[in-house]
């Protein structure tokens, strides 16, 4: 009898093996707390050191330099820390890359690109990261995560998923719902609406399909019920089992273990 692994068609490419959870931290204090949590729970989640929502206006340089310092420090126990830069329309996104890539490009787990409005936006930022890495003498491919949270990004998601160095497609719910200008009630940013509203469910399915068909990881948005780990668990479970997401964001410490538990194979 033929074994299923011999009979079933295989694409030849495997999905990246990365943690099923990433925890966002926007200040040095919270990043260091995240590292302490990694030491306690083990290497089961990444930490995203956030420039976009973390840097104070006028202090973008200092914030990026802080991220370089902590990522390279002994406080980073497993080398499982990435960063989110400013979006394409922000004047400092190139500056973020100019600081982060030469300073921590050998150690950053990934770079997340937010709020792209088209394939061309994402392509421009990916190419700038590649050029900056080459100029800095970094030979590794720095994994890139692209946040799909606008109409334009969703429209181009299949093409964006083919960009080099892209490892993850993140679905961003809040900006996506906001972009519908009231057509999707705000209550659908939470469960059960975030899984049941047809426009949101269709968008999530489209992101997952684009990611998996291009051998990259689809990542689910946060749970806004911050202090309810059971709700986080149920959201992660539904995202994994009913939509095919293989990773999920955390923005509150108690969400991490809930996501990891729900997304275990």
PLM region descriptions:
Residues 1-265:
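Expand to "…catalyze enediolate/carbanion chemistry for C-C bond making/breaking, isomerization
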């Amino acid at each position: 009898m033929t074994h299923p692994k011999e009979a079933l068609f295989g694409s030849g490419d495997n999905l990246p093996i990365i943690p099923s959870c990433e925890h966002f931290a926007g200040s040095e204090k919270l990043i260091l707390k995240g590292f302490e949590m990694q030491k306690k729970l083990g290497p089961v989640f990444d930490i995203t050191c956030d420039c976009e929502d973390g840097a104070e206006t006028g202090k973008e340089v200092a914030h990026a330099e802080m991220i370089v310092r902590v990522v390279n420090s002994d406080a980073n126990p497993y080398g499982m820390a990435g960063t989110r830069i400013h979006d394409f329309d922000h004047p400092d996104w190139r500056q973020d890359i100019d600081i982060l890539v030469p300073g921590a490009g050998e150690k950053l787990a990934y770079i997340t690109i937010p709020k792209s409005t088209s394939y061309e936006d994402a392509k421009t930022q990916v190419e700038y990261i590649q050029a900056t890495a080459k100029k800095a003498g970094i030979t590794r491919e720095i994994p890139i995560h692209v946040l799909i949270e606008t109409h334009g990004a969703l429209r181009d998601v299949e093409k964006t998923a083919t960009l080099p160095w892209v490892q993850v497609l993140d679905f961003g719910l809040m900006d996506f719902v906001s972009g519908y200008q009231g057509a999707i009630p705000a209550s659908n940013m939470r469960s059960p609406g975030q899984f049941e509203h047809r426009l949101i469910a269709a968008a999530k399915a489209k992101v997952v399909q684009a990611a998996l068909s291009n051998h990259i990881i689809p990542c689910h948005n946060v749970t806004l019920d911050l202090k309810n780990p059971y709700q986080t668990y149920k959201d992660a479970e539904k995202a994994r089992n009913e939509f095919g997401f293989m990773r999920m964001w955390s923005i509150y410490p108690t969400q991490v273990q809930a996501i990891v538990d729900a997304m275990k194979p």
